[in-house]
From Swiss-Prot:
Name of the protein: Phosphoribosylaminoimidazole-succinocarboxamide synthase
Stored InterPro entries: SAICAR_synt/ADE2_N, SAICAR_synth, SAICAR_synthetase_CS
Pathway the protein contributes to: Purine metabolism; IMP biosynthesis via de novo pathway; 5-amino-1-(5-phospho-D-ribosyl)imidazole-4-carboxamide from 5-amino-1-(5-phospho-D-ribosyl)imidazole-4-carboxylate: step 1/2
One of the record's GO cellular component terms: cytoplasm
Transmembrane segments: none
Organism: Neisseria meningitidis serogroup C (strain 053442)
Length: 287
């Protein structure tokens, strides 16, 4: 990624943050891909641009539910034109917020770590589910399964709702749960009408200077969610997906021990991943 004339204040798995002033920052989505909490050496071309477009679409679509990190400004308001041109599709001028110290994970279907948990315990993150459920089955109701926010390279850990309340306070935990479930429910209904099932997703929240809960980071992208094509969805299977699951599945069968460094991902797997991200963007946003 090209250098810009702002000070970098944070480098995450996928996004880099640059300081504009004490109230605003520039959030830039790179083409980096992380899987199993390891950043892979091979970037996914255009991924940052596609993710930013999907995220921006959802931020606007769900703005009636709660405030978000948008400032209403563009990169051209904060960068010289030559720098803004390079980054305009992958950067957002965002409010500086105090992050809420939990990941807000919402699940509508039984898959991934939730399915593994259910097979062992009959529950997902301590939430009891009916007996005899199958992989990829829709849950009787949407569930909120928070996790801790780990540093880059560490694993997030699932926690109970009670533990979530201990970390961020009971009242805030209840607000986070209610908002996360509402965001997911509304988005899942819309996505289904466009041929995408949103199996599960992760929201990030922050507090502004007045203590108002605000949606931030990225929203309902193939990186923060499991998207399934509705026409290929079948209970009792692990449906194909529009996201990095494609890379994850390849890594799972590669024999890798899930510690850095990751093996080199074949070019065709990268190409198919780009196509999947692009397809998700098209389905969701094209009229």
């Amino acid at each position: 990624m090209s250098e810009i004339g702002l000070v970098k204040i944070y480098s995450g798995k996928v996004r880099d943050l640059y300081e504009i002033d004490d109230k605003r920052m520039l959030m830039v989505a790179s083409d980096r891909l992380s899987a199993f909490d390891v950043i892979l050496d091979d970037p996914i071309p255009s991924k940052g641009e596609i993710l930013t477009q999907i995220s921006n679409f959802w931020f606007k679509k769900l703005a009636h539910i709660m405030p978000n990190h948008f400032t209403g400004q563009t990169v051209y308001d904060v960068l010289p034109e030559n720098e803004a041109k390079v980054l305009e599709k992958r950067a957002v001028v965002a409010k500086k917020l105090t992050p809420v110290k939990v990941e807000a994970i919402v699940r509508g279907y039984l898959a991934g770590s939730g399915w593994k948990d259910y097979q062992k315990t009959g529950s997902v993150c301590g939430i009891r589910l009916p007996e005899g459920m199958q992989e990829a089955q829709q849950l009787p109701e949407v569930i909120f399964t928070p996790s801790t926010k780990a540093a880059v390279g560490d694993h997030d850990e699932n926690i109970s709702f009670e533990e979530c309340g201990r970390i961020i306070g009971k009242e805030l935990a209840e607000e986070v749960r209610a908002k996360a479930v509402r965001l997911y429910t509304e988005a899942a209904e819309y996505a289904k009408s466009r041929g995408i099932i949103i199996c599960d997703t992760k929201f990030e929240f922050g507090l502004d200077t007045n203590g108002t809960l605000t949606l931030m980071d990225e929203v309902l992208t193939p990186d923060s969610s499991r998207f399934w094509p509705a026409d290929q969805y079948k209970v009792g299977t692990n449906p194909p997906s529009f996201d990095k699951q494609f890379v994850r599945d390849w890594l799972e069968q590669s024999g890798w021990n899930k510690k850095a460094p990751a093996p080199k991902v074949p070019a065709d797997v990268i190409q198919k991943t780009v196509e999947k991200y692009r397809e998700a963007l098209t389905l969701l946003t094209q009229d």
